[in-house]
Amino acid sequence: MYGSFTQLGDSFSIDLRVVDALGVKPAKPFFIQKQGIINILPAVDELVDRVAGEFTSGNAIADVKVRGTKVLDPDVVLMRLSTRKGDPIDPAAINKEIKRIWDLGYFSDVQASVEQGGDGTVLVYTVTEKPRIDNIVIEGSDKVGHDDILAAMSSKTGSVLNDKLLAQDLQKVTELYRKEGFYLAHVTHRVEARQGAASATLVLNVEEGNKLYIKKVKIEGLKELSESEVKDILALSERGMFSWFTGTGVLKDELLERDSAAITAYCLNHGYVDALVSAPKVDYEEDGIIVSFAVKEGPRYKLGKIGFDGELIDTDERLLKVVKLDDHKKDNQYFALDVMQTDDKLLSDYYADYGYAFAEINSRTQKSAEEHVIDVTYVIRKRQKVYINRVLVEGNQKTRDNVVLREMRIADGDMFEGAKLRRSNERLNRTRYFSQVDTELVPTQKEDEVDLKVKVKEQNTGALIGGVGYSTFYQFGVSGTIMERNLFGKGYYASLQAFFSGKRNSFIASFTNPRVNDGDLSFGNDAYISREYFDDFSKNTIGDTIRFALPVGEYSTVGWGYRLDRYELYDIDDDAAKIIKEREGENISSVAHVRFTRDTTDSKEKPTKGTIFKTFNEFGGGPIGGDDDFIKPVVEFQAYHQLAPNHVLHGRTRGGAVLENGQGDVPVFERFYIGGIDSIRGYNSRDISPRDPESGDRIGGDRMAFVNLEYIWVFKPDLGLALVPFFDMGINYDSSAEFNWDDELKKSVGLEMRWRSPMGDLRFAYGFPLDEGRDGEQHSGRFEFSMGQFF
């Protein structure tokens, strides 16, 4: 290679001659000209590229081919190659491509060669496929179904054997066994190839071993903390007597780290700020699993000063009443992380109630390692007070915007208030139109204004339900219901119900408009017809009820209405009580009612906190006519208190009286009857009742009260399963007769299981009476259940 460099003024040129070393070909000239001496290096680079292109053009790849595939498409290989047409032959790059093809796992041999074709150089990769899987055989699997194993595998019949996928499949099958409790399961494989055939049988051999449960959970290293109390907060637990029912004792790998974090949190919540918790250790033995956690508690820290810093909107004294840490310090002198974190939320909500929607709360701790004391300072940045520009609804397909907006307690132009937003969410959830309600504050062009976006996810509000049910009073029955809670997307409730049994046949048609003209007034109507068969008489009824309700404040409702029934008593036994015989034939019942309800619970279907107070007063006969003259006030109070997630205390008390309203006795079916699964469990339905002194028939009481105390443990939240130990007691008596507490007060204890099933609430209760019966004998325990739809 030789040449010359020439410069004329500001321009220059380079002349280059490349000579064939063998002297066979003439010298090849190359020339380049540029302006400005500064471009000399780019000019040289360009000349080099021209020379390289000239001498490699004859070795450029004209095509890339794959040979030897039988089952696989050649594109499976070609799509993974980086070498393309026009690339120069590069041995290092080809070696990388061979490795890339080999790593696919489908081939037992890969070779590369270069051939000369009509269009130039052809790069050929020659492969030898591994056998095709024509059958998969599973040996030794009894506890896990073959279909489940095959479904978990990526290797399929008809595919080419791939060692990489096969290794993953063995791991998947092993994990499948682990999920079923077979932690010692060992899975191997072999390939049975037929001589001269391109296919083979893949055989999986499974050694299942014993199904293992957790036999011991160890918390090692504890000095001050109670091991039993620490174990109570773990999701993993030892196998016990009722594990077959509760599902405890099963090792779930995803819960190991969760429990390690739970122990750390428990230590922090009890003042052990420096606590260290090891990663969980799992030992598999022939008779069970041992799970161990090593804990180093460290010193326990007391609470020191509690203060506030930053942009405060109230005095320290007032803010101390907002947070819980100060009260915790008085009751328990040690630091608690969970209380401090709760305080962050409480302070954020407090500031939000004054319009500071984006207030930032940061808890700052100062630890004294010498004195083992922690000072806590809540640092607050209130940021901008904001107002609502617009309330927007998103996600509603069926429900109209006004149905959502009328439940909101915050509107366009209002100052943002966290309490009103939280109450709005509660109200929307209580409609039961939506499975999910979320709110989002969206900034606008003004710093002090936001749009409030209400995001709802609609759920199925209609139902067509049919079922077979049973109650101890109505016995076996068949029910059917057509119901819609959000008719036409306007929030109307409508239902048609039918029930047939040996004791009762009934039809009910109901309609409710909860917000007439989007106002506060609600209106409803119930039309019904029924036929009931009692021990001493039968009764046919046709009637209608109209009802109204109006909210009073945020949690209370006043209701009123009117009921008009025409009923007939017939087939009355000759020895029936006089009070029953007096009503033989057709009668008219004209009844007005007034009710008051205050409900502060957090949920209609699954309350965990709050109270319900109800009073229902009926006024029959007198100035509004009819044959039934009575006054019937009933009061009920319920309270819920959550002890821990899925653990709720529930108390209920109900009492009432029925009074004469003019002449005549109170009808027997307007009097009180208690006993059974809805009042005093362990006694027959409606069995706790005064009896006619002559006939011995139950004629109901005119004074009634009962109490239910329950501990609700939802042990399977996803299935809605709960165990409910209970204590019931109550009285039902006739005020005109002699009263004796020892005879009238009835008590029972027992256990109930509840299931929120797709067909409705199912209840299974076993109650044991604690008092003697009328005959002076001790009653035995009684099992009751109710299921299906009863009206």
Swiss-Prot record:
Its main location: membrane. Belongs to the BamA family. PROSITE patterns: POTRA. It comes from Nitratidesulfovibrio vulgaris (strain ATCC 29579 / DSM 644 / CCUG 34227 / NCIMB 8303 / VKM B-1760 / Hildenborough). It is found in: Cell outer membrane. It comes from the Bacteria. InterPro entries: Bac_surfAg_D15 (IPR000184), BamA/TamA_POTRA (IPR010827), D15-like (IPR039910), OM_assembly_BamA (IPR023707), POTRA (IPR034746). This is Outer membrane protein assembly factor BamA. It holds the Pfam family POTRA. Residues 59-130, 131-209, 212-298, 301-383, 386-459 form the POTRA domain. Part of the outer membrane protein assembly complex, which is involved in assembly and insertion of beta-barrel proteins into the outer membrane. GO terms for biological process: membrane assembly. GO terms for cellular component: cell outer membrane. Part of the Bam complex. PANTHER family: SORTING AND ASSEMBLY MACHINERY COMPONENT 50 HOMOLOG, SORTING AND ASSEMBLY MACHINERY SAMM50 PROTEIN FAMILY MEMBER. HAMAP family: OM_assembly_BamA (MF_01430).
